[in-house]
Amino acid sequence: MRNEMHLQFSALSQNESFARVTVAAFVAQLDPTLDELTEIKTVVSEAVTNAIIHGYENDPSGVVYISVIIEGHTVHLTIRDHGKGIENVEEARQPLFTTKPELERSGMGFTIMENFMDEVNIYSKVNEGTTVELIKHLTKSKALCN
């Protein structure tokens, strides 16, 4: 069985915690380990923060889109924006790369996503936006959505 959720919200930094908690509540039906749930919450925070700060440059008129699909023991997350896009995705994936060096703890978002998820795909076009697809295979899951 498959279960899915879709969410959209204004590109405001205070909505990052809302997105993180909402996704965690949805994924909790699979009874993930605490580590798995923490990793999912962390990558949602990183991807949403990237969309708000880098994609929309803190323009609250932007909209961030999240979809979560559960299939068996696997969680598929997609975070999308219609912001300014990424010129060079491979460069952006390098640890410590940032276009905003003035920001604290910049340059680790994609590295964190790659360390916590089983698969990370990033699609981006300049002036059209970015889509981040994240896949996590849960290890100790009762998988209520079989």
Curated annotation (Swiss-Prot):
It catalyses: L-seryl-[protein] + ATP = O-phospho-L-seryl-[protein] + ADP + H(+); L-threonyl-[protein] + ATP = O-phospho-L-threonyl-[protein] + ADP + H(+). GO terms for biological process: asexual sporulation; negative regulation of sporulation resulting in formation of a cellular spore; sporulation resulting in formation of a cellular spore. The keyword Translocase does not apply. GO terms for molecular function: ATP binding; protein serine kinase activity; protein serine/threonine kinase activity; sigma factor antagonist activity. InterPro entries: Anti-sigma-factor_SerPK, Anti-sigma_F, HATPase_C_sf. Keywords: ATP-binding, Kinase, Nucleotide-binding, Serine/threonine-protein kinase, Sporulation, Transferase. Its EC number is 2.7.11.1. HAMAP family: Anti_sigma_F. Binds to sigma F and blocks its ability to form an RNA polymerase holoenzyme (E-sigma F). Phosphorylates SpoIIAA on a serine residue. This phosphorylation may enable SpoIIAA to act as an anti-anti-sigma factor that counteracts SpoIIAB and thus releases sigma F from inhibition. Belongs to the anti-sigma-factor family. This is Anti-sigma F factor. It comes from Anoxybacillus flavithermus (strain DSM 21510 / WK1). The gene is spoIIAB.
